[in-house]
């Protein structure tokens, strides 16, 4: 996009030059026959300035020129050409002047932004998502820059964003101009995701060689829906830069599963129905496959949609592990929507958690209403009302769907459809959600808990957090672990909240030997399922010896390049296997993490700057 903007600027300059040349040429017959060569050139150049400034005194010159032309037709054509040039040349000159002044103005803004010590936020592009994120920053004391946006019209910028700086340079070029000591946030959030990745890698290359005192002040957020991009970023030498890969669909699904836990709507059997298998439901399928791993619960996932065979094949290629007997996932690919409804009626009548995502927001709303009526009719007493979560992106349709949630929210209609929308840009693209969400804060605490477990003592928190920033794969694993904490608490009839309460309980009072084992099994099953949804597969002892000897695993028992891990196995087999491979029972790590949940929620390391109180909630058996 930046290259195209530069090309557009060059075209304007070239066009202006052509107009100047055309105006000069068309007056050559007059000035060069009236004056000698030198005076003719100077007079014609002076005349160009008169044209640009719209000097009315040159009107008499037209009459003199036309009078000197004998042919009336040629004279009329000549006058038309003069008129076009005398209109277009001043207009284009004024446009060029405004562009130059605007560029100078934005450069002055950039200079003062560089002198101020307040945080700086730089976006790679001005688009719907970056604009929504920018709005959430407007009330903070910061400077905001949109790269690659200077040639956009001022009218494209909303009134409440007038103090935002627009620059025509790329985000990497702007980065060179700023002091290295201030907190700087780069958001690579272009519509072209390949371009976003390119900008991210350029920024990493620039800052990875900076001093270690500089790198912690640099925060790079790369937005992409492609999971493989994180592998590319992890392979770059990024020092201790704070780099995060933001997957919009993953954020939406994690937020949904955290706000509306699977356990809330099930007593012992979790049955999730996914209507359709597009990108958002594929991400949901992966997350639910590990999120629903709970000792004492069974998990069943049903996916029904029109012609989903190709999507299923892609999923089987990228995550073959979830197609094994350990998982109960059924796919119903139908020829039309009527067949989909028939399949749901026949095989999914006991579903207690439903996610719908159609080809458009309208289709999603329509399908959700059909499913609501269907599930009511499946029960002779019309009491079957599982929650239906609708993926709605458009803000206006999102709000309309919210009115269908309960009768109380839409009293004029007095009708309850119990549809719960998710996916609005206004909900997800905020600074708080992206940077400091509860899940993100807890994931850092999970990382610090692991650091303590594997160091057998006190840790250097700053160095530990730097290690958190190095690999995206570790951050994704920690986020999944943080999300699952709520589910583990639900097994005990507990939950957590950030609100102050006098009803808080102490988790350690609930820890018995049986409870610790139950939660440890749940943690191992969650970890194993998470790896399999990421494409990992089990490896035998022979596999471990082979890739250890080859050097591809760098001596480790697992191999990230091959995505093979020997501990993808039942919990009961883990003790003997880990003793043989490592000489110790690795199940202890699961138990130690469970023991540290109070430290994670209590913000032992003072990273989250908030504490999560543990409270009682209605148990599933009550």
Task: Name each model-derived stretch.
Residues 26-32:
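Juxtamembrane "helix-exit" motif on the non-cytosolic side of transmembrane helices
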Residues 539-569, 573-581, 586:
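Surface-exposed intrinsically disordered loops and tails
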């Amino acid at each position: 996009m930046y290259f195209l903007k530069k090309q557009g600027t060059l075209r304007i300059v070239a066009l202006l030059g052509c107009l100047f040349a055309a105006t000069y040429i068309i007056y050559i017959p007059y000035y060069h026959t009236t004056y000698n060569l030198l005076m003719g050139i100077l007079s014609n150049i002076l005349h160009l300035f008169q044209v640009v400034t719209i000097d009315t005194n040159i009107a008499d010159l037209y009459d003199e020129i036309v009078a000197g032309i004998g042919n009336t037709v040629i004279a009329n054509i000549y006058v038309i050409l003069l008129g076009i040039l005398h209109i277009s040349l001043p207009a284009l000159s004024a446009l060029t002047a405004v562009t130059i002044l605007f560029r100078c103005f934005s450069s002055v803004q950039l200079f003062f932004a560089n002198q101020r010590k307040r945080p700086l936020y730089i976006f790679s592009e001005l688009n719907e998502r970056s604009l929504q994120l920018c709005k959430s920053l407007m009330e903070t004391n910061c400077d905001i820059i949109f790269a690659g946006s200077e040639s956009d019209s001022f009218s494209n910028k909303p009134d409440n964003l007038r103090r935002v700086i627009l620059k025509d340079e790329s985000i990497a070029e702007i980065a060179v101009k700023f002091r290295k000591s201030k907190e700087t946030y780069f958001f690579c959030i272009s519509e072209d995701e390949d371009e976003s990745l390119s900008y991210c890698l350029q920024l990493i290359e620039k800052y990875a060689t900076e001093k270690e005192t500089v790198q912690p002040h640099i925060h790079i957020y790369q937005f992409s829906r492609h999971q493989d991009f994180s592998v590319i970023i992890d392979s770059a030498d990024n020092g201790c830069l704070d780099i995060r890969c933001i997957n919009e669909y993953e954020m939406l699904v994690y937020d949904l599963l955290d706000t509306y836990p699977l356990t809330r709507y099930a007593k012992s059997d979790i049955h999730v129905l996914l209507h359709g298998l597009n990108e958002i439901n594929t991400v949901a399928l992966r997350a639910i496959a590990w999120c629903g791993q709970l000792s004492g619960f069974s998990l069943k996932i049903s996916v029904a949609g029109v012609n989903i065979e190709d999507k299923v094949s892609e999923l089987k290629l990228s995550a073959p592990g979830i197609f094994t007997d350990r998982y109960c996932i059924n796919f119903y690919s139908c020829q039309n929507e009527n067949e989909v409804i028939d399949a749901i009626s026949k095989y999914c009548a006991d579903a207690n958690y439903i996610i719908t995502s159609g080809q458009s927001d309208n289709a999603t709303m329509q399908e959700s209403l059909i499913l609501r009526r269907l599930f009511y009719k499946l029960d002779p007493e019309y009491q079957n009302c599982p929650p239906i979560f609708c993926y709605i992106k458009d803000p206006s349709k999102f709000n309309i769907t919210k009115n269908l949630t309960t009768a109380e929210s839409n009293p004029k209609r007095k009708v309850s459809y119990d549809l719960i929308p998710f996916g609005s840009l206004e909900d997800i693209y905020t600074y708080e959600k992206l940077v400091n969400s509860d899940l993100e804060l807890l994931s850092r605490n999970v990382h610090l808990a692991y650091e303590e477990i594997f160091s057998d003592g006190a840790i250097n928190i700053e160095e530990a957090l730097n290690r958190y920033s190095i690999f995206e794969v570790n951050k994704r694993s920690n986020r999944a672990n943080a999300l699952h904490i709520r589910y583990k608490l639900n097994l005990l009839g507990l939950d957590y909240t950030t609100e102050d309460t006098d009803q808080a309980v102490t988790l350690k009072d609930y820890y018995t030997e049986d409870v610790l084992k139950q939660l440890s099994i749940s943690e191992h099953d969650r970890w194993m399922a998470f790896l399999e949804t990421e494409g990992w597969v089990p490896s035998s002892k022979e596999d471990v010896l082979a890739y250890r000897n080859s050097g591809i695993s760098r001596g480790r028992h697992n191999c990230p390049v091959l995505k093979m891990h020997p501990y993808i196995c039942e919990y009961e087999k883990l003790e003997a296997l880990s003793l043989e491979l490592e000489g110790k029972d690795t199940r202890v790590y699961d138990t130690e993490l469970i023991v540290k949940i109070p430290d994670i929620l209590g913000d032992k390391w003072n990273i989250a700057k908030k504490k999560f109180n543990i409270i009682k909630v209605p148990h599933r058996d009550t």
